[in-house]
Amino acid sequence: MKTLILAGAGHGHIQILSKLQNMDLDDLKVIVITNFDRQFYSGMLPGYINGSFSLEDVSFKVEDYCNNPNIELIFDVIEEIDKNENVVKTKNGSYSFDYLCMNLGSKSIESFGPETESLHYVKPIYGFKELKDIGGGKDQLLIIGGGAAGVELALAYSHKYPGLNITIIDKHDDILLKFNDRTRKLSKKILDFRNIKVMYNTDIEKIEGNTAYYEGGELKFDQALVSTGVTGVDIKYTGFEVDEKNFLKVNNKLFAADNILAIGDMVHIREFPHMPKAGVFAIRMTPILVNNVFHVIFGGGELESYVPQERYLQIINTSDDKAILSWGPFAMYNKLALKIKNKIDMDYMKGNLVTDSFMKRFEKK
């Protein structure tokens, strides 16, 4: 019997498990290793915070996708993955594999030391199950980083706590640098209307206690959220190629070795070294991953290559029953934009990325 290990339980692995749990796995043992009992979808996090969605709406319970006697779910922390020995080492054990697929995500760059009761990093997303209720009354919420996550979180908390004092700090001279001019103008107008302060060209040098220090000043806060970029997770990859941020190098078919694949934020695709870390790319990777994993294990079909889309839809939930939709140079701010976002997100959570007709290519003859 061969062994497939799924390291991590991201959405790509949920898709694989949703198919495997209904298959005859007499010749295959599947081990799922994760330290999180739920897998969250970051795109719906603002809606979860502002009260539009429940915990069940925005997350998967991993054990619900392990309903097959040949699928074993292990809750543990992965510390090392050894390509040479074909083994995954965790805090409490060691597991050999014939095939390995990794979906381990990324983590926030911890620029200001470890988390505290008042300092929080946006990733991993799991922590927001607890952060949903931070800050109320007249508290001061500081958000460091003016990208999409920072802006959406500011607007979500503003909706949830109308009396909350919110400040976004960014080291650049503008926010939402990966968006078009129209989107930036709309966002700044909305932030201003909601009394959310934005400090530009301000680089936080250190945080001590509940004080953030920058050149020429300091800012007191009750809670701080940091969203200033991501790095690879804290795992030792023995025998693999990684980049300077510990992102795992794979080819455009998502292979790190002949029997090892990976997907999502954790990967650095050699053919596309400058591809952004964004959920829209991971979504498009998922059918490629499922196809190639099943091809390696079961045969059938052909290996497929992933090519990132050059232009993609971006939607910012403004937590006022509207959203800003951005496409190329175009942007619109209205209720329709939010309806489009919610439709995309809910379809994504229903897991319709891999169809039954797609799976027929792997049926036993």
Protein language model annotation of sequence segments:
Residues 29, 70-72, 118, 165, ...:
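Conserved beta-strand segments of alpha/beta enzyme cores
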Residues 319-365:
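C-terminal auxiliary extensions adjacent to catalytic cores
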Residues 1-7, 68-140, 214, 221-227:
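FAD-binding core/adjacent interface of flavoenzyme oxidoreductases
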Residues 73, 80-81, 162-252:
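A Rossmann-like FAD-binding core segment of flavoenzymes
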Residues 131-167:
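Rossmann-like NAD(P)H-binding beta-loop-alpha module
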Residues 117-138, 218-284, 291:
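FAD-site-proximal beta/loop scaffold in flavoenzymes
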Residues 1-70, 152-178:
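Beta1-alpha1 glycine-rich phosphate/pyrophosphate-binding loop at the start
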Residues 266-318:
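A conserved FAD-binding loop/helix module that cradles the flavin
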